[in-house]
Amino acid sequence: MGDSIKVLSENRQARFQYEILETYECGLVLLGTEVKSIRAGKVNLRDGFARIRNGEAWLMNVHISPHESTNPSYNHDPLRDRKLLLHKQEIRKLVGKVEQKGLTLVPLKLYLKNGRVKVSLGLARGKKLHDKRQDLKQRQDKREMERAMKQR
């Protein structure tokens, strides 16, 4: 029996803005209305990041839209901080890397794995402007090469 994975949201902008060094799979502590909205695909990871406070990992600035068919008084705050579920050793390892090397934790994708919502967290270093330009140029050159090969 393999793991059934369904990607619900992907942060493509993160791969452009950051150089991803390592990835971690984390669970999330969510409310019921948040799970319903996530399953409906109403989530935006673009501005999200993770922080470690008091030995706990927190996902911040990720927008999960309120569920439509739920009474507004029972709905959740779209931008609330959400706790990430990681092992203590992983958190300790991340603290050292984030504080000493000046790296950032960025959510890369949100997915369902065996019915549970997981987030793929990337340990990332910010790219400089010339690195971004170089990536764009390489992508454009690759596209042109493929186009030329197709015309033959």
Swiss-Prot record:
SUPFAM superfamilies, sorted: Small protein B (SmpB)
Q: What domain of life does the UniProt record list for this protein's source?
A: Bacteria
Query: Could you tell me which Pfam families the record lists for this protein?
Result: SmpB (PF01668)
Query: Where found?
Result: Cytoplasm
According to its record, what are the GO cellular component terms?
A: cytosol
Q: Which GO terms describe its molecular function?
A: RNA binding
Q: What is its main location?
A: cytoplasm
This chain's source organism reads: Thermosynechococcus vestitus (strain NIES-2133 / IAM M-273 / BP-1)
Query: What HAMAP family does the database record attribute to this sequence?
Result: SmpB (MF_00023)
The record ties this protein, via InterPro entries, to: SmpB (IPR023620), SsrA-bd_prot (IPR000037), SsrA-bd_prot_CS (IPR020081)
Instruction: Identify the keywords attached in UniProt to this record, alphabetized.
Output: Cytoplasm, RNA-binding
Quote the protein name from its UniProt record.
SsrA-binding protein
The entry sums up its family as follows: Belongs to the SmpB family.
Q: List GO BP terms, alphabetically.
A: trans-translation
Name the residue ranges with Basic and acidic residues bias. 132-152
Disulfide links within the chain? none
Which residue ranges does the record annotate as region Disordered?
Answer: 130-152
Describe the function of this protein: Required for rescue of stalled ribosomes mediated by trans-translation. Binds to transfer-messenger RNA (tmRNA), required for stable association of tmRNA with ribosomes. tmRNA and SmpB together mimic tRNA shape, replacing the anticodon stem-loop with SmpB. tmRNA is encoded by the ssrA gene; the 2 termini fold to resemble tRNA(Ala) and it encodes a 'tag peptide', a short internal open reading frame. During trans-translation Ala-aminoacylated tmRNA acts like a tRNA, entering the A-site of stalled ribosomes, displacing the stalled mRNA.
